[in-house]
Curated annotation (Swiss-Prot):
Belongs to the DNA polymerase type-C family. DnaE subfamily. DNA polymerase III contains a core (composed of alpha, epsilon and theta chains) that associates with a tau subunit. This core dimerizes to form the PolIII' complex. PolIII' associates with the gamma complex (composed of gamma, delta, delta', psi and chi chains) and with the beta chain to form the complete DNA polymerase III complex. This is DNA polymerase III subunit alpha. GO terms for biological process: DNA replication. Signal peptide: none annotated. Keywords: Cytoplasm, DNA replication, DNA-directed DNA polymerase, Nucleotidyltransferase, Transferase. It comes from Ureaplasma parvum serovar 3 (strain ATCC 700970). Its EC number is 2.7.7.7. The lineage of its organism: Bacteria, Bacillati, Mycoplasmatota, Mycoplasmoidales, Mycoplasmoidaceae.
Length: 969
C-alpha cells in the first residue's frame, strides 16, 4: 500500500489547501493505517495532527521539510527522541540559527528530495536516483485532487502578491495531489516502494504529556519556595489587617492556612511567587495593576501577596472557585495592567527568567469569507467596487459559510452567477491560516529550556514565540500567564498624574471613601459616560432602575447585564424595591440568596447552595457548578442523583429537593463569577469617583483616549459643557499632543494629535521646534516652526483650525499674509512688518466663522457647535408652547420646531429673479440646509452667523424652508 509521505497542510501558510481534517479524511476514506504531516520549516499543526490521528486509530507520521546546505530534506521522527530532535531543528530554522546534521541520526529518517547531499547513515534516503539502494517513493502533496489545483495556485498567488494567471502559466504542480497505489506504481521504482514500506514500519512516535514545569522563584535562596510564600503571606496579612502578632482574626488565619496547604500540595508555590514578583515589580515602578481579575480575587493568599486587592473574606468570595484540592489543571491568575506599560512588565519577565525560559504564544489569523473574497478578487483582477459590494452583503454571522451567505442574500446570488470562480475558490480558502500572530495577553514560562519542550520561532522584538497555539501548551507542563493591557487603568493613571500636576494632590484609590453618596448618586442617575462597564445605553437603563448604593450593587448590575441573566433584571428590581413578594426555602438558603433577592446571580451562589443543601464538600460543589455551566449531561445525571440523595439525608423533603434542583439547573448556567465581577466593580467605582471630584482632569484624559472615535468624542465634549467646562480648540501657545486643561478658567483645550494628518513624527517636529525657540508673538511661533522644518502647508492648517487665535489676529489675515511672513521671518533679524497688525480687519475675529469647514475637516467638529449642543437645556419649555423636533420630522403639513445653529448664509436668485437664501446650519451635530424664500426675506435681518435659533420649518418641493423664528437662544 502506497502512503503519501510528503504531505503539507495549510499550516505551511498559503502553501497547501489541506487542513488536518483533510489529511485524516483521506487516510480513513482510503483505509490507510498511516497518515503523514511534513510542513515546511514549522511544526504549527503537529499536535493537532497527532491528536486527531490517534483519535481515529491512525498511526501519525511526524516530519519536517526544510532547506539544508542547498538541498531540500524531509526528516521523520522514528520515536519520541526523534520528535524532540525535530523540535530543535525547527526552532533553529525559525530563529535563523545554523546547525549541523551528524551522520548518526538513529532516531530519525532523513530523505533528500532535492539536491545531492549524502549522509553516511542507514536512515538516509534520496529520491533523484530511483534505482539506487536508498531510493524512496516520495511525492510532495499540496492539495487533495486535481480539481483543487486551482485553489492551490490561488494560494500561491495570494502569498506572492501576483495575479493567478501568472501561476497558471509558469508553474507545474499537476501531480502534487494525493497519489493512489496505481499512480505510485507508475511513478516510482520497486526499490523505492519497498524502502517506503520498510520506513513506515520504523516510524512509531509517541508524544508524552509532561509534568508541570514551573520556574523556581528564587534558586539562590536556601529557603524552599513554600516557606518563602508562607512568610510573605503572614507578613502581607498583618499589613492588610493592620494587625500585630496575636491580633489577626482567626477566620483569616484558618483560611490562609487552608489555602497555603492546597497550594503546597498542588506544588503551585512558585507559581504564586512568580505572579507576586512581577506584580510587585509593576507597582514598585508606578505601573497601575487592576485590583483583580477572574476567580483569583477569591484567594486570600493572592490578597496577602498584593496580587489582588479584594478582601475575599469581607466579600464572602470562595477560594475553591479558583483552586480546589481535586482540580487537575493549573491555577490561572489573569492580571490587568495599564496598557501603555504592559510591555515593561513582560520585558521584566524575559529579563528575570531568561530568553530561553519565556515565550510569547502563537495565534493564527484565519481566512474568513470577506478576507478570502478580497484576496481572491485581487489575484483575479476583479474591480475593487465589485469586491466591496460583495463584502458589504456578507453578514458577520456568515463569515465562515459563503454558501449560506449566498443562499440568504439576493445580491450575492446575482454576484455568484457573474463571478463563480471568485466564490468557488474563496469557499475553499475559508478557515485556512493566512498568517501568524501573537496572543494578546498570554506568555509561557518554563524551568527547562522551552525549545527542549516545544518548537519556537522569533516573535515580538525577536523574543521567542511558541510554534504551538495556546490549547496545546498546558499538556507540556508550560505555565501560561495572562497579562492583559487595560486602557481604563491607563486613564486612571493619567488622571491621577494630572491631578498631582495641577492641584498637587496625591490620590490613593485604596483609601478613598467607597460609600460616597455623591458618587452613587451619579451612578443612580446614570451619569456614567466614560465609566468602565457602565456607559452603554442598556447599562444606563439598568442603573436608573437598580439605583446602586454600594460596590456590591455595581457588581450585581454588571453580572445581570448579560444576554442570559438580563431576563432577571425586572424581577430583581421589583424585589429590591419591595414591589414583588418572594420567599426563601429556609434560613440557610436565605443567607446565600438574600444579597440578590432570591435570584441566582453568581456561580459562587450555586456552589454554596449545593454545599448547604446536599452536604457536598466544596470541591464537589464546584464540579457540580462546572457540569451545569458546560451542560454536561453525563456528569449531571450522576450529580443530580447525588444531590437528591444528599439533600434527603440532610432532612429536605423530596418535592422541595426537586424544586430546588430545577431552579438551580434553570439559572445556574447563567451565573457569573462573583470574584471577577466585584474586582471590576472597583475599577468602575474608581473612575466614577475621579469623574465626580476631578471632572476637569477626568474628561481631559478621557477625551485624549477617545479622540479617534468621533461619536464618543462628541458625547464627551457635550458632557463637558454640562459641567460648565469651556472647550477650546488647539492653541499653539499651549502645545500638547493630548487635551490639556486650565484649572482656574475651567477650560479643556484640544490636543494637537486630534488634527487630521498630524502624526507622531510631525508632532515631534513641532514640539522640538517650539522647545528650541524663544517665543513671544505669533511671528516668533511661525519662525520657530519654519526653522523646525514644519512645512508651509502644515502651518496653514494650524492657522485654519485656530491654533493662532489666542494672539488676537484673525485667520483670514494670517492666511493672506502667510507667504510673506514665512519668507521674511529670520532674514537678517528683520521680521514681517508688525504695523500691519494694527489694521482693524486683522483683529476682527468674527471672520473666523468662515473657517468652520476647516475645523470640521481637520478636527472632525466645528468648535462653535459645542456651544450649540448645550443650548437645548437653556430653553424655557414652560414659556414655549411647542416641542423641539428632530430634523427628519419636517413635513409639508405643519410647522416643525427645529433647534439650529447658523453656520453660513448664501444669497442667490431663482429663475424668476426672486431672492432665495440658503442657511447652512448645524442640527443635532449634523450639517443641514434650511431655506428662506422671497416672501420671508425680512427674517434674514434677524439672523446672524453663529447664532442659535428655534425655527418654525416646513417642507416644500424638497426645500426645508423657514416660516418664522420662534426664539433666539
Amino acid at each position: 500500500m502506497f502512503i503519501n509521505l510528503n504531505v503539507h497542510s495549510h499550516y505551511s501558510l498559503l502553501n497547501s489547501t489541506l487542513s488536518i481534517d483533510d489529511l485524516i479524511k483521506y487516510a480513513l476514506d482510503n483505509k490507510q493505517p498511516y497518515v503523514c504531516l511534513t510542513d515546511l520549516n514549522n511544526m504549527y499543526g503537529c499536535i493537532e495532527f497527532y491528536d486527531k490521528a490517534k483519535a481515529h486509530n491512525l498511526t501519525p507520521i511526524i516530519g519536517l521539510e526544510f532547506e539544508y546546505q542547498n538541498a531540500t530534506l524531509v526528516a521523520y521522527a522514528k520515536n519520541y527522541n526523534g520528535y524532540l530532535k525535530l523540535i530543535k531543528w525547527s526552532s533553529w530554522i525559525m530563529t535563523s540559527k545554523e546547525f549541523e546534521i551528524q551522520d548518526d541520526f538513529d532516531d530519525l529518517i532523513i530523505v533528500c528530495k532535492k539536491g545531492t547531499i549524502v549522509f553516511k547513515s542507514p536512515n538516509f534516503y534520496q529520491t533523484h536516483d530511483q534505482n539506487a539502494p536508498n531510493a524512496i517513493a516520495l511525492q510532495s502533496v499540496f492539495y487533495a485532487n486535481k480539481n483543487d489545483k486551482i485553489v492551490f495556485l490561488a494560494m500561491l498567488a495570494i502569498k506572492n502578491d501576483l495575479k493567478l494567471e501568472d501561476f497558471k502559466n509558469c508553474c507545474d504542480f499537476d501531480n502534487n495531489h494525493f497519489l493512489n497505489d496505481n499512480l505510485a506504481q507508475s511513478f516510482f521504482s520497486p526499490i523505492a516502494l519497498n524502502n517506503l514500506n520498510k520506513v513506515l514500519n520504523e516510524l512509531k512516535v509517541q508524544i508524552h504529556d509532561l509534568p508541570i514545569n514551573i520556574p523556581v522563584y528564587d534558586k539562590q535562596n536556601s529557603i524552599i519556595s513554600s516557606e518563602i510564600l508562607k512568610q510573605l503571606c503572614i507578613s502581607g496579612l498583618k499589613k492588610r489587617l493592620n494587625a500585630n502578632d496575636g491580633q489577626v482574626n482567626k477566620i483569616y488565619v484558618q483560611r490562609l492556612k487552608y489555602e497555603l496547604d492546597v497550594i503546597n500540595e498542588k506544588q503551585f508555590d512558585d507559581y504564586f511567587l512568580i505572579v507576586y514578583d512581577f506584580i510587585n515589580f509593576a507597582k514598585s515602578n508606578g505601573i497601575i495593576v487592576g485590583p483583580g481579575r477572574g476567580s483569583a480575587a477569591g484567594s486570600l493568599v493572592a490578597y496577602c501577596l498584593h496580587i489582588t486587592d479584594i478582601d475575599p473574606i469581607k466579600h464572602n468570595l470562595i477560594f475553591e472557585r479558583f483552586l480546589n484540592p481535586t482540580r487537575k489543571s493549573m491555577p490561572d491568575i489573569d492580571t490587568d495592567i495599564m496598557d501603555e506599560k504592559r510591555d515593561l512588565v513582560i520585558e521584566y519577565l524575559f529579563e528575570k527568567y531568561g530568553n530561553d525560559h519565556v515565550a510569547y504564544i502563537l495565534t493564527f489569523q484565519r481566512l474568513k469569507a470577506k478576507m478570502a473574497i478580497r484576496d481572491v478578487g485581487r489575484i483575479l483582477g476583479i474591480d475593487l467596487k465589485v469586491i466591496d459590494k460583495i463584502c458589504k452583503n456578507i453578514k458577520p454571522e456568515y463569515d465562515e459559510d459563503l454558501d449560506l451567505a449566498i443562499k440568504k442574500n439576493t445580491i450575492l446570488k446575482e454576484m455568484y452567477l457573474l463571478h463563480k470562480e471568485l466564490f468557488e475558490i474563496s469557499k475553499k480558502l475559508i478557515n485556512a491560516p493566512r498568517q501568524i500572530g501573537t496572543h494578546a495577553a498570554g506568555i509561557i514560562l518554563s524551568d527547562s529550556l522551552i525549545s527542549n519542550i516545544i518548537p519556537i520561532q522569533l516573535g515580538i522584538n525577536d523574543r521567542p514565540l511558541s510554534q504551538y497555539s495556546m490549547e496545546y501548551l498546558e499538556r507540556f507542563g508550560l505555565i501560561k500567564m495572562d497579562l492583559l493591557g487595560l486602557k481604563n487603568l491607563t486613564i486612571i493613571d493619567n488622571v491621577l498624574k494630572m491631578i498631582y500636576e495641577n492641584q498637587n494632590k496625591k490620590i490613593d484609590l485604596f483609601n478613598i471613601n467607597y460609600n460616597d453618596k455623591f458618587v452613587f448618586e451619579d451612578l443612580a442617575k446614570a451619569r456614567t459616560n466614560g465609566i468602565f462597564q457602565l456607559e452603554s445605553p442598556g447599562m444606563k437603563k439598568v442603573l436608573l432602575k437598580v439605583k446602586p448604593q454600594n460596590i456590591e450593587d455595581i457588581s450585581i448590575v454588571s453580572a445581570l447585564f448579560r444576554p442570559g441573566p438580563q431576563q432577571n433584571i425586572k424581577t430583581f428590581v421589583e424585589r429590591r424595591f419591595k414591589r414583588e413578594e418572594f420567599s426563601y426555602w429556609n434560613e440557610a438558603t436565605r443567607k446565600i440568596l438574600e444579597p440578590t433577592y432570591g435570584i441566582i446571580v453568581y456561580q459562587e451562589q450555586v456552589i454554596e447552595l449545593v454545599k448547604t443543601i446536599a452536604n457536598f464538600d466544596i470541591a464537589t460543589s464546584d464540579n457540580f457548578r462546572r457540569a451545569i455551566s458546560k451542560k454536561d449531561e453525563k456528569i449531571l445525571i450522576q450529580l443530580k442523583d447525588d444531590f437528591i440523595n444528599g439533600a434527603l439525608n440532610n432532612n429536605y423533603k423530596q418535592p422541595l429537593v426537586n424544586q430546588i434542583f430545577e431552579y438551580i439547573f434553570s439559572f445556574a448556567h447563567y451565573g457569573f463569577n462573583h470574584s471577577h465581577s466585584l474586582a471590576y466593580s472597583y475599577i468602575s467605582y474608581w473612575l466614577a469617583y475621579l469623574k465626580h471630584y476631578y471632572t476637569l482632569e477626568f474628561l481631559s484624559v478621557l477625551l485624549s483616549h477617545t479622540s479617534a472615535s468621533k461619536d464618543k468624542l462628541l458625547s464627551y465634549l457635550n458632557e463637558a459643557k454640562e459641567f460648565n467646562i469651556s472647550i477650546k480648540g488647539p492653541d499653539i501657545q499651549y502645545f500638547s499632543n493630548d487635551f490639556v486643561i486650565d484649572t482656574q478658567k475651567q477650560i479643556i483645550r484640544f490636543g494637537f494629535k486630534t488634527i487630521k494628518g498630524f502624526g507622531d513624527e510631525l508632532l515631534k517636529k513641532i514640539k522640538s521646534a517650539l522647545q528650541k525657540s524663544t517665543l513671544s508673538d505669533y511671528i516668533s511661533y511661525i519662525d520657530a516652526l519654519k526653522k523646525g522644518n514644519v512645512s508651509l502647508k502644515n502651518i496653514e492648517i494650524l492657522i485654519r483650525v485656530g491654533t493662532f487665535d489666542s494672539f488676537g489676529i484673525n485667520r483670514l489675515f494670517l492666511l493672506n499674509n502667510l507667504n510673506e511672513i514665512f519668507e521674511k521671518t529670520g532674514l537678517n533679524g528683520h521680521f514681517f512688518d508688525l504695523n500691519l497688525v494694527g489694521l482693524d480687519y486683522a483683529k476682527d475675529m468674527s471672520v473666523n466663522d468662515r473657517y468652520l469647514d476647516d475645523e470640521i475637516q481637520y478636527l472632525g467638529i466645528d468648535l462653535n457647535s459645542l456651544n450649540y449642543a448645550n443650548y437645548k437645556t437653556e430653553i424655557d419649555y414652560n414659556k414655549l408652547k411647542y416641542t423641539i423636533k428632530d430634523f427628519y420630522e419636517i413635513n409639508t403639513n405643519y410647522e416643525t420646531n427645529i433647534l439650529a445653529q447658523v453656520l453660513n448664509i448664501k444669497q442667490s436668485k431663482t429663475k424668476n429673479g426672486n431672492d432665495i437664501f440658503y442657511l447652512e446650519t448645524l442640527i443635532d451635530n449634523k450639517k443641514q440646509t434650511l431655506t428662506i424664500f422671497q416672501n420671508s426675506k425680512y427674517l434674514i435681518d434677524e439672523i446672524s452667523i453663529g447664532g442659535i435659533y428655534v425655527f418654525g420649518v416646513k417642507l416644500l418641493n424638497h426645500f426645508n424652508f423657514i416660516v418664522n423664528i420662534k426664539q433666539r437662544i
